[in-house]
């Protein structure tokens, strides 16, 4: 989904926004309309800040929520921990503490075990729990799992952030509206992605906890995430939300992942590494099979020790492509 292009309706919206001039830095009608789209999802009391980059959205959110003496508790597979080049540590100056996960998810019980040194002057103080929805291995937290984690976090004075780079895929997988497993469960802030689901380059920070709204616009600028021509970020979101395009895109991607998993199930030379719950399929394969397949297709081996590969499906992945790919996998046996 990182390699796919832009949905035609999003591209059309960009072209329409590219006519004439508009006030910069978000003082334009497109940004106001996009913010209204978010309020329609989450309620009028939320605050939304559009940004160009996913890593920037996460780091900006973290930087507003905690201080340098805090630690962020996250899954050992969390993108913010493994794949953002130390951006959190460099910008926020805090420690990332990974918690062993099961299929990419942490539990309330596992979280509790990391809250034993609260108040100690010798240790970084846990200040934030960072969740990813859907996870880095395409699994999905249930509302019950999120609520349990939020309850433990808040009871111990920690805030909760959700990295929603693929939040649409999670919403489709759960079959419920996005507010019901974020704001309504007490999540304090989230990154709301779109780039991986048919947009060109736009993300957003959605703030539920009003304590974090003050000075956010200034921090966004200081953290290099204030776009001058904001209307081009906003126009994408307007098209993205119109007529449920964001859910339609995610539903197709999820369905293609399920189709691929079904087609390769039973093949003796491949093994599912994680449950297929959104738009990714992770499998264990022999090194020679990986090498042979990579000569035809572009994909990554994400866990070399287990020879686990990652196949992500997108809004524009066709059923024919999936069946052709599955046939190539079958031919390796």
Where are these regions (language model features)?
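Catalytic PLP-binding core of fold-type I/II PLP enzymes
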Residues: 141-171
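Hydrophobic beta-strand scaffold residues
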Residues: 95-96, 160-162, 272, 299-301
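PLP-dependent aminotransferase-class I/II
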Residues: 92-127, 131-136, 141-148
């Amino acid at each position: 989904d990182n390699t796919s292009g832009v949905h035609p309706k999003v591209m059309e919206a960009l072209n329409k926004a590219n006519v004439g001039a508009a006030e910069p830095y978000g003082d334009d009608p497109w940004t106001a309309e996009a913010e209204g789209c978010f309020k329609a999802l989450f309620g009028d009391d939320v605050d939304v800040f559009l940004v160009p980059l996913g890593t920037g959205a996460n780091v900006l959110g973290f930087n507003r929520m905690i201080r340098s003496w805090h630690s962020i508790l996250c899954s050992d597979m969390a993108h913010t921990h493994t794949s953002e080049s130390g951006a959190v540590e460099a910008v926020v100056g805090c420690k990332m503490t990974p918690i062993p996960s099961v299929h990419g998810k942490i539990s309330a019980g596992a979280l509790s075990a990391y809250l034993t040194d609260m108040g100690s002057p010798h240790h970084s103080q846990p200040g934030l729990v960072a969740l990813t929805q859907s996870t880095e291995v395409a699994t999905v937290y249930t509302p019950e799992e999120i609520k349990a984690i939020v309850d433990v976090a808040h009871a111990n004075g920690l805030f909760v952030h959700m990295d929603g780079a693929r939040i649409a895929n999670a919403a489709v997988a759960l079959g419920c509206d996005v507010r019901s497993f974020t704001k309504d469960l007490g999540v304090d802030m989230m990154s709301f992605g779109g780039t991986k689901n048919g947009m060109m380059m736009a993300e957003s920070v959605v703030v539920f906890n009003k304590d974090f709204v003050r000075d956010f616009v200034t921090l966004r600028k200081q953290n290099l995430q204030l776009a001058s021509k904001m209307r081009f970020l906003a126009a994408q979101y307007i098209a993205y939300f119109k007529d449920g395009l964001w859910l339609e895109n995610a539903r197709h991607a999820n369905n293609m992942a399920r189709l691929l998993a079904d087609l390769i199930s039973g093949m003796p030379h491949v093994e599912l590494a994680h449950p297929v719950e959104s738009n990714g399929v992770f499998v264990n394969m022999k090194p020679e099979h990986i090498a042979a397949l990579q000569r035809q297709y572009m994909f990554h081996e994400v866990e070399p020790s287990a020879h686990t590969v990652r196949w992500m499906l997108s809004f524009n992945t066709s059923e024919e492509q999936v069946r052709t790919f599955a046939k190539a996998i079958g031919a390796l046996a």
